[in-house]
């Protein structure tokens, strides 16, 4: 019975992976800090650890800091349902 209880507890525990580190986010949690970006990502500026801030290729960055009235704005992102 003790062996069965030990076995159940062992299976229920989350496995510990050595070398697993926290993913650093950038650009308001829309990007990920990596040494090199993937094929579907574009590098944008740098993170605090001197790695590239990788954003998805479909992301658009507004330099002015305010949302512009184009097809990518929040109001025009989805069609309106009447």
Curated annotation (Swiss-Prot):
Superkingdom assignment: Eukaryota
Family matches, as InterPro entries: Defensin_big_dom
Membrane-crossing residue ranges in chain numbering: none
Q: Where in the cell is it found?
A: Secreted
Q: Name one GO cellular component term.
A: extracellular region
So which residues are the signal peptide here? 1-19
- Return one Gene Ontology term, BP aspect: defense response to Gram-positive bacterium
Per the UniProt entry, the disulfide pairs are 26-53, 33-47, 37-54
Q: What does this protein do?
A: Has antibacterial activity.
Q: Which family does it belong to?
A: Belongs to the beta-defensin family.
What is the name attached to this protein's record? Beta-defensin 119
The record lists the organism as Canis lupus familiaris
Q: What is the lineage of its organism?
A: Eukaryota, Metazoa, Chordata, Craniata, Vertebrata
């Amino acid at each position: 019975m003790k062996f069965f209880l030990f076995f159940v507890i062992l299976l229920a525990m989350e496995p510990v992976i050595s070398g697993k580190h926290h993913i650093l986010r950038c650009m308001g949690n829309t990007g990920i800090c990596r040494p090199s970006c993937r094929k579907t990502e574009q590098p944008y500026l740098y993170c605090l650890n001197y790695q590239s801030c990788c954003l998805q290729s479909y992301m658009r960055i507004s330099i002015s800091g305010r949302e512009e009235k184009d097809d990518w704005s929040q109001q025009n992102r989805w069609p309106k349902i009447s």
